[in-house]
């Protein structure tokens, strides 16, 4: 089962194209709409999104799907949600599309003149959680990403322990082309888990 966490600019409706492609992989999947997204009530805080991911995990577990049969998939902001959950439980695998190291590091790029370290409440500090993820990882990132620097995806990949796999695509931007090449890499990764 693939547990999918979408990015900041996303909602359930504009991820259907990805889910249609993922369906070809003959996997069960669950995509959640965080609080404050897709018409849901609440504020999308870091703690709130982590709580939403835990609720999804518990729901899958209550439906007899063990963590060892769950693959986490995060895109952009969702990578931080996936990394947080993955740092706490042993899942089958984790796929990160366009990951960032931390919100503090990312914000320093956009606002170098502000003391973001002091101003940011939601830190999404993925880079300091990844050492706890011992199960297989796939990091995917386009080298023309104009939102999250490609260097952050590479740094996340390099910081992970083995087993790890990468799919770095020349010419792709933040929303990677969800084409047969990308799907093939996901499929190969999933086959490695079996």
Residue spans for each PLM region:
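Acidic catalytic loop of the alpha/beta-hydrolase fold
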Residues: 143-148, 174-176
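Post-His helix in hydrolase/transferase enzymes
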Residues: 177-192
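Short beta-strand/loop motif that positions the catalytic acidic residue
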Residues: 132-134, 139-145
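Short alpha-helix in the alpha/beta-hydrolase fold that links the catalytic acid
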Residues: 18, 126, 135, 149-158
